[in-house]
């Protein structure tokens, strides 16, 4: 099973559209958004996804009731909002959390309950294997905000190979 992972989109409409196109091309079966959607108007673009999406609330989410209203008004299908997801996907136990508390993120990785931990928040894309756990932070969609920062990116995790890849979504 292929799982799309995106985070910290911060209203970057062109890159959100590009990410959705990539997820559809990759034939992911679900997308996990690790938080910081920011403005609810951007939810309309996720309608083009060919799969369900789960949105984590980040530290820049804004009014959750407004997000729920917009999701419904835009006709977004098969979606869910939450602060934490513990999921069984493709035979793997997956934890998804925004990542704004590094101690919690670290505890999820080290606890032994999960095969995968998806997080965001710090805008630093990385894929790291820690023991049997793969930790995926897809990075952000914002422009490079500091010298030497990784380019804007998303990630795709494959439960069959227990591996992930980062995909550059820079313009």
Q: Model regions: which residues?
A:
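Core catalytic region of metal-dependent phosphoesterases/phosphodiesterases
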Residues: 2-88
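Beta-strand-turn-beta hairpins that frame and shape the catalytic cleft
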Residues: 1-4, 86-95, 129-135, 161-166
């Amino acid at each position: 099973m292929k799982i799309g992972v995106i985070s910290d989109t911060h209203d970057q409409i062109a890159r959100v559209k590009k990410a959705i196109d990539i997820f559809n091309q990759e034939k992911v079966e679900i997308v996990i958004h690790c938080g910081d959607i920011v403005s609810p108007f951007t939810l309309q673009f996720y309608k083009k996804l060919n799969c369900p999406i789960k949105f984590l609330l980040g530290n820049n989410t804004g009014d959750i009731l407004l997000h729920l209203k917009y999701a419904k008004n835009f006709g977004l299908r098969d979606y869910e909002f939450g602060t934490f997801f513990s999921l069984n996907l493709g035979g793997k136990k997956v934890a998804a959390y925004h990542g704004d508390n590094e101690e919690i993120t670290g505890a999820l990785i080290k606890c032994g309950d999960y095969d995968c931990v998806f997080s965001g928040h710090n805008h630093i894309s990385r894929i790291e294997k820690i023991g049997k756990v793969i930790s995926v932070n897809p990075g952000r969609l914002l422009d490079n905000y500091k010298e030497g920062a990784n380019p804007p990116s998303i990630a795709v995790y494959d439960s069959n190979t227990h591996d992930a890849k980062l995909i550059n979504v820079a313009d």
